[in-house]
């Protein structure tokens, strides 16, 4: 069984039980929606790695194991654990000698992107990456529009800290972001945008 930071427990033997009332509805739906974007980014990253283009991986979600059962000598079963809040962002790695760090978010709302989808510690982390010369950005997918935007981190963090509103309008992404191209082998080919913005010939 998995315990969340608030001390509540959720049984994880099946997807149906995971999405129980012990877990806030918004968090469950957001996690489910994010899996498709995450899957596509992972496929893209595998292509980059296989073709020696870049080394970029998803960061593991921190978990504290509380109890382990050993039903067999050769098997161990985790029966209780805590999900920790992620401390930074989703992905990081190296591309063309530069450190790459980014967050990826799915969004089901057509007209805007809720700022609560990005946590304050993630904003601080993105700012820190920029201060130390890394390339940081946010990938936001408007699911219903089937559009995926690349947004440089500074534009997101500036909006987060200065705008007097709780969401970022869709039109803002059209002006401040770049649509990410897609192909069969690279469903979210974000390095094409990195090349265009950060490695101008």
Model-derived segments and their meaning:
Residues 151-173:
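Short, electropositive alpha-helical surface patch
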Residues 127-157:
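Nucleic-acid nuclease catalytic cores
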Residues 53, 68, 82-93, 162, ...:
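Positively charged, polar, low-complexity stretches
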Residues 105-132:
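Mg2+/Mn2+-dependent nuclease catalytic core
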């Amino acid at each position: 069984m998995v315990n969340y930071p608030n001390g509540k427990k959720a049984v994880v033997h099946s997807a149906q039980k995971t999405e129980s009332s012990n877990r806030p509805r918004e968090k469950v739906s957001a996690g489910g929606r994010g899996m498709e974007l995450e899957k596509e980014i992972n496929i893209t990253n595998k292509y980059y790695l296989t073709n020696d283009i870049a080394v970029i991986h998803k960061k593991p979600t921190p978990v504290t194991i509380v109890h382990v059962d050993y039903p067999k000598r050769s098997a161990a079963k985790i029966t209780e654990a805590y999900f920790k809040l992620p401390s930074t962002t989703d992905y990081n790695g190296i591309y063309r000698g530069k450190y790459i760090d980014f967050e990826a978010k799915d969004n089901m709302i057509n007209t805007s992107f809720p700022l609560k989808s990005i946590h304050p510690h993630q904003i601080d982390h993105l700012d820190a990456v920029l201060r130390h010369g890394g390339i940081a950005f946010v990938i936001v997918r408007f699911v219903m529009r089937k559009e995926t935007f690349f947004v440089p981190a500074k534009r997101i963090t500036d909006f987060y800290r200065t705008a007097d509103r709780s969401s970022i309008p869709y039109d803002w992404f059209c002006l401040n972001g770049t649509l990410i191209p897609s192909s069969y082998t690279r469903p979210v080919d974000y390095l094409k945008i990195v090349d265009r913005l950060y490695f101008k010939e």
